[in-house]
A protein has these predicted regions:
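Conserved HGGG/HGGXW glycine-rich cap/lid loop of the alpha/beta-hydrolase fold
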Residues: 9-65
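Active-site loop/oxyanion-hole signature of alpha/beta-hydrolase fold enzymes
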Residues: 47, 53-94
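Flexible "cap/lid" loop of the alpha/beta hydrolase fold
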Residues: 105-148
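Active-site nucleophile elbow and catalytic-triad environment of alpha/beta-hydrolase enzymes
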Residues: 167-184
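Short beta-strand/loop motif that positions the catalytic acidic residue
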Residues: 188, 194-196
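Short alpha-helix in the alpha/beta-hydrolase fold that links the catalytic acid
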Residues: 190, 204-213
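Acidic catalytic loop of the alpha/beta-hydrolase fold
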Residues: 198-203
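Catalytic active-site module of serine/aspartate enzymes centered on a nucleophile-bearing elbow/loop
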Residues: 220, 225-251
Length: 251
């Protein structure tokens, strides 16, 4: 896969398919290009659009973190610095952003800052911190320390330990309890599709209701039964159908 220098770091990226608009996939807090599996290709095929996937700094085969870092503004940094530079260098003017979990929050921050987008498709987005989500992240830390989770993450990330702590340490920082991006939602004026699993261990429908109440564009909510934190894996048919319908309506 090719690499691109963004904000002083070499980031791995991949193109799939062709056609407009361009779909930009923003992975979750422990995600990567490979962890999307074949889902982006399915969306690209169903819509006739090209898809861009990339690994954020510290993820996948992109540059390893130079040193462990914890910042509660890591999603702001991505949305306001790295993502605009990446899209400019790849000459992507008005994308459709498809974000999962932290990636969905990054999409909202990017659009809320006034950057041009055609629409936002959000899976399991976070706009504020819920106590049940913190408990789940604490549980994942225990799993990382006591199970083979580091080895499993190592299949996808050059330095799984630093990747894990980039995400986990930030979310468990006491300051992160006050993290909230609801103030940016009023500046989101494009169509939004927000998808949430009933059994998501990191967030509830309260996240989606907050988005719908605050954004200025149209906002469709999709609540899926039998679905956890990864709707595209737990309910792939329903999610693919909803995404394809949403994206075709934007054309």
């Amino acid at each position: 896969m090719p690499f691109l220098d963004v904000a002083g770091h070499s980031l791995e990226y991949e193109w799939i398919g062709g056609g407009e608009p361009t779909l930009v996939f923003l992975h979750e807090g422990l995600g990567s290009i490979r962890q999307w599996r074949d889902f982006p290709a399915q969306v690209a095929a169903a819509t006739g659009c090209r898809a861009l996937l990339y690994n954020r700094y510290g993820y996948g085969n992109s540059d390893v973190l130079a040193a462990p870092r914890v910042t509660v503004r890591f999603m702001h940094d991505e949305a306001l610095v790295a993502l605009p530079e990446l899209l400019a260098k790849l000459e992507i003017d008005v994308p459709v952003l498809i974000g999962h979990s932290d990636g969905a929050s990054i999409a909202l921050l990017y659009a809320g800052a006034g950057h041009p987008v055609r629409g936002l498709a959000l899976m399991a987005p976070h706009v504020f911190v819920e106590e049940m989500g913190i408990r789940s992240i604490e549980r994942v830390r225990r799993e990382f320390e006591t199970t083979d989770l580091p080895q499993r993450l190592g299949r996808y990330h050059r330095d799984a330990r630093r990747t894990f702590h980039l995400w986990n340490d930030a979310w468990l920082d006491p300051q992160f309890r006050h993290w909230n991006i609801e103030e940016c939602l009023a500046s989101v004026c494009v169509p939004v599709l927000a998808i949430q699993g009933v059994d998501d261990e990191y967030g509830t429908m309260a996240q989606l209701r907050s988005i719908r109440e605050r954004v200025k564009g149209s906002c469709e909510l999709l609540e899926l039964a039998g679905c956890g934190h990864s709707p595209h894996r737990d309910q792939p048919v329903a999610v693919l159908e909803a995404l394809a319908r949403f994206i075709r309506a934007l054309a």
